[in-house]
Amino acid sequence: MSTTDEDKKFLAVAIAEARQGRSEGGIPIGAALVVDGKVLAGGHNRRVQHGSAIHHGETNALENAGRQSASVYARSTMYTTLSPCHMCTGAILLYKIPRVVIGENQTFMGAEELLRLHGVEVVVLNDDTCVSMMKEFIAAEPSLWNEDIGEHD
């Protein structure tokens, strides 16, 4: 499936989540779980805010969606401002989410090939807002960024 106006609309929800996370002093990565053309839940990276090792944007969106049946996930798309890391990719695969729309993968290349290997449709938008948001954050807070992606300073 190609990029649609709907993809841009739902990526905007993830971007708003990312901005919210940054305004809270956190890392500007956001996500939205969309089912049947409606936002089921949004989320943003809350590792700093919650002192958490696992509250990335995608996992926070899944948490905010609450318990769902497998049939709901089977009809969903995960929108995320940044290419999903291995942990978030694992959650996407666990719940068999069939489609992931990524804002950008220039500042961080996640496990996109693993998603594709498991039959997930991956769409990368290379959105300028997502790229600039991450570049600005990484320049301002390199240590926090390295912590988030499991890298040494």
Where are the regions that the model predicts?
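A short helix-loop-beta-strand connector motif used in the catalytic cores of GNAT acetyltransferases and
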Residues: 23-27
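Zinc-dependent deaminase
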Residues: 1-21, 90-153
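Short secondary-structure boundary/capping segments
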Residues: 31, 69-70, 112
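Mobile, glycine- and charge-enriched loop segments
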Residues: 58-82
